[in-house]
């Protein structure tokens, strides 16, 4: 899913995760909802809201991790780390290295679980037929991996959520 900044990609994904759960389809991965407050300041959007930061919500557990804070706010509040990966990449957002590590560990857990659940000799998804789609075997149950979002740190710097791209 791609699109311009602030057009509702994460809100759409949140709705999709809910709809799929209602249909019995599990979603794993990460959602990245913004931390928004009403504002009339210079950083307010056209709807009168200001984005202060970004959380990461780990799926399926729903664990919420404070992930990123707008750089100017992080500098003013004090948690900005000049040695962090995000600072070295000169991003507009301050992302705590521990938060990156936690989300990467989550994707590593997803990969390990998927590898353990795959039957020996299983064909890649692209080579499977629809046969067995109704199987009660959890390793064959439908599911969706959500990675919200990949940005400059991942795509141009080879950092950030590297486990999501593995």
Give short role names for the model-derived ranges.
Residues 1:
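Hydrophobic anchor at the beta1->P-loop junction of P-loop NTPases
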Residues 5:
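The conserved Walker
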Residues 9:
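Conserved lysine of the Walker
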Residues 14-86:
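N-terminal phosphate/diphosphate-binding loop that engages ATP/GTP or pyrophosphate donors
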Residues 16, 162-166:
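Catalytic-core regions built around general acid/base machinery
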Residues 44, 112-141:
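Intrinsic disorder/low-complexity segments
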Residues 76-114, 142-156, 165:
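Phosphate-binding/switch loop-helix module in NTP-utilizing enzymes
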Residues 159:
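Conserved TIR/SEFIR loop-to-helix hotspot centered on a Trp-containing motif
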